[in-house]
Every structure is written in structure tokens, then in C-alpha cells.
Design a protein with these regions (language model features):
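Short gly/ser-rich loop at a beta-strand->alpha-helix junction or flexible surface loop bordering the NTP-binding
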Residues: 2-9, 15-139, 143-182
Length: 182
């Protein structure tokens, strides 16, 4: 198959992932992984990290950093804690690092803006937002009680309910807990 055909297929796949494509993705769509390196050598795709590439001609979005953080960690990685709140612009959080949860040991050298949290979450606390594996907003609010001010979490709870990210019952439960703690 011609290189342009590989590039086009990878591009079509990467569009749904903020311009990123992983070696595992290439394998899944039956493109030899070696083709990623060839495209990078020709400047058609940028090598970001081991097994991770990006088409820089796709405009960046506010979600890129979150997707990249999870992709760099790989495996069962997911956003967790204040990163989930930041993804949804809840609670006026602006963390300096993107917290990524995983149950496995990570040996890769990661940039300083990625913080690993060793955790194993039940399936009910895992989801995907904007095609990014993530802990649920409910789990994130629970995990941020000691690090985010109660007033901000109360606003986050109401905003999350408004956006359909929490049920009415979850909103009531969190409001009762947070107002009692305040």
C-alpha cells in the first residue's frame, strides 16, 4: 500500500483523537507500525512519545493535553481527581498537572505536567468524556474534597448536575455532605 494511503487512514483515525495516533491504533487499523516512524521521518507526523504520534496540521483544542496525558501513560489510564473537574471546567480548578490514574506501574519518563495516581477503580467509576478515558465526575468530586474548597465544589456539583454529569440524587448527596463540612 502507498504511504499516502497509510497517512490518509491514520489521519482519518486521528481526527477522532485530537490528532493523536498510537502504535496500537495503527496495528488495529492494519497499518504496519513501522509506517508511523517513516511518516515522522518525512515530517508528516510528529513523534510525541514512545508509541504516540500527532498530526500537527490538525488544530489544537483544549482537550489535547488531557488526551495526550492518558495516551502517554497507556494501558488502563484515565483522568482522575481535579483533572476530571478541569476537563469539564467545573469548580474553578486549574491544576498545574494533569492527574492520570492507573492500576499499573508506569516506567515511562513523563513530562512534569503529568502526575500518576496509582488507583484501581470499579467499572462504575470509569467512563469516557470527549473520547478520553476518565473517572466519573462523581468520583472526581469525592476525591477532591480535601484539596478543593467546599464552596467551589458546591458550585461544581450544581454545574455538573446542570450539564447532566450528575444525577439529582448525587447532587443532593454531595450538597448535604459539602454543606455539612462547610
Amino acid at each position: 500500500m502507498r504511504a499516502e494511503s497509510y497517512r490518509r487512514r491514520l489521519w482519518d483515525f486521528a481526527v477522532g483523537q485530537y490528532g493523536y495516533v498510537r502504535a496500537a491504533d495503527a496495528h488495529d487499523i492494519e497499518i504496519p507500525v513501522v509506517e508511523l516512524g517513516k511518516l515522522a521521518a518525512r515530517g508528516q507526523i510528529r513523534h510525541v512519545a514512545y508509541g504516540l504520534y500527532r498530526f500537527d496540521d490538525l488544530p489544537p483544542t483544549r482537550f489535547d493535553r488531557f488526551f495526550e496525558a492518558v495516551a502517554r501513560v497507556g494501558g488502563d489510564a484515565h483522568l482522575t481527581g481535579d483533572a476530571v473537574l478541569a476537563l469539564h471546567e467545573l469548580g474553578q480548578v486549574n491544576p498545574q498537572v494533569v492527574r492520570v490514574g492507573t492500576s499499573r506501574r508506569v516506567r515511562a519518563q513523563l513530562p512534569k505536567w503529568i502526575a500518576i495516581e496509582r488507583e484501581t477503580l470499579p467499572d462504575g467509576d470509569l467512563t469516557s468524556y470527549e473520547s478520553i478515558p476518565s473517572a466519573t465526575v462523581a468520583h472526581a468530586i469525592r476525591s477532591c474534597r480535601d484539596t478543593v474548597m467546599s464552596d467551589r465544589l458546591l458550585v461544581a456539583v450544581d454545574d455538573a448536575r446542570r450539564d447532566g454529569l450528575l444525577s439529582v440524587a448525587e447532587q443532593r448527596e454531595f450538597r448535604a455532605e459539602l454543606e455539612g463540612a462547610g
